[in-house]
């Protein structure tokens, strides 16, 4: 039943994207909400996703051409094969790092979209860009910090292995260092990534510094690490299925039919172009899904840990009134001709004191 000023008394009736309740969400609701967010705002989400995916995949393809283009045309010998395997491993790691950075950047851009849906505010096609644009520098810095911390933990754990190999130590020591270092490094990398991933939505919505967003992510993740890990793991499985089996196979088939037996620079460039196009298409679809899950995880943690949904409902007023900063049961002092600015939406999410805006009469 509708409550005062538009809030619904039924906690399950008001939703994020007309399918996800405005309350703490289950894992299935988080995944469904990310998909529904893409369907409801396809032009906004897919437009941002195509831009990010194109940069990532073109960069990967250019690196692939310069890393293995010559080796692919050479006669296959043990040395060439070893160099090719090393290049493939390097390209795989580079692709994973770039993809993870793209997901983090997209999560920061998706946060205002889903945040406005959460409080029932309209979203213009370029609204997400206007919300995130003032924070692009810190968003990129936060994404780099999350990836840097995760990869740094992996590097520190495997450093003894490579140091022993470089020092030509006894093989047994290298084997022991590898058996201990690689699992430990991978575990630390995953643990830190999941612990810090919510810093990306926080730096955009809460207007925090990079270090402040990282501390905020640690606070929000307390006691819910395994829940976050399980949710992101399921999202990864969906991504692999949609991105490879459903979307990449047609392009791989075209690549095999037209360039499978061909040789020469033209065939190499053609096969690489088709493969790049396939990766752009597949990543443009799955990237906003992964990013939406991260953004919704942040909002879920705000509601579970801090009662963000209950805080807004307890004020007994609409989102517009909350943004305007008017008294709980009085109309907002906003002039009819003054539109609600982007900073008003951000004020909903900030946890620090908000400066007063003269036209509302709101107190800091």
Positions of predicted regions on the chain:
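Selective recognition of hydrophobic, aromatic-rich stretches within alpha-helical transmembrane segments
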Residues: 2-19, 85-124, 169-213, 245, ...
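Nonpolar helix-loop interface/hinge motif
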Residues: 4-68, 188-275
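Membrane-embedded alpha-helical bundles of multi-pass transporters/translocases
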Residues: 33, 37, 47, 134-146, ...
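Perimembrane loop-to-helix junctions flanking transmembrane segments
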Residues: 70-85
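Juxtamembrane transition segments at transmembrane-helix termini in multipass membrane proteins
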Residues: 2-7, 192-205, 232-364
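Membrane-interface alpha-helices at helix entry/exit sites of multi-pass transporters
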Residues: 127, 139-143, 215, 228-231
């Amino acid at each position: 039943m509708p409550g005062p000023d538009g809030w619904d008394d039924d906690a399950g009736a008001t939703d994020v994207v007309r399918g996800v309740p405005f309350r703490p969400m289950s894992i299935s609701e988080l995944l469904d909400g990310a998909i529904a967010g893409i369907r409801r705002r396809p032009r906004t989400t897919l437009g941002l996703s195509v831009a990010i995916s194109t940069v990532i995949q073109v960069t990967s393809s250019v690196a692939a051409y310069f890393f293995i283009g010559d080796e692919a045309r050479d006669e296959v010998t043990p040395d060439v094969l070893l160099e090719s395997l090393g290049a493939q491993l390097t390209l795989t790691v580079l692709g994973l790092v770039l993809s993870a950075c793209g997901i983090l950047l997209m999560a920061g851009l998706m946060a205002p979209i889903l945040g406005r849906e959460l409080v029932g505010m309209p979203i213009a096609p370029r609204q997400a860009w206007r919300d995130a644009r003032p924070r692009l520098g810190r968003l990129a810095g936060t994404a780099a910090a999350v990836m840097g911390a995760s990869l740094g933990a992996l590097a520190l754990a495997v450093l003894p292995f490579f140091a022993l190999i470089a020092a030509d130590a006894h093989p047994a020591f290298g084997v022991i260092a590898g058996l201990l270092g690689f699992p430990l490094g991978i575990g630390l990398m995953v643990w830190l990534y999941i612990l810090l991933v919510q810093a990306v939505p926080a730096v955009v919505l809460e207007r925090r510094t990079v270090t402040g967003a990282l501390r905020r992510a640690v606070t929000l993740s307390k006691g819910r690490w395994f829940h976050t890990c399980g949710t992101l793991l399921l999202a990864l499985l969906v991504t692999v299925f949609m991105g490879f089996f459903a979307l990449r196979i047609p392009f791989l088939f075209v690549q095999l039919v037209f360039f499978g037996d061909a040789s020469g620079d033209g065939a190499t460039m053609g096969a690489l172009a088709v493969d790049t196009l396939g990766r752009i298409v597949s990543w443009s679809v799955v990237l906003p899904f992964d990013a939406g899950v991260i953004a919704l995880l942040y909002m879920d943690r705000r509601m579970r840990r801090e009662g963000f949904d209950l805080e807004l409902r307890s004020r007994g007023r609409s989102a517009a009134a909350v943004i305007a900063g008017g008294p709980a049961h009085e109309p907002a002092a906003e002039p009819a001709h003054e539109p609600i600015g982007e900073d008003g939406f951000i004020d909903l999410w900030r946890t620090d004191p908000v400066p007063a805006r003269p036209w509302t009469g709101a107190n800091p």
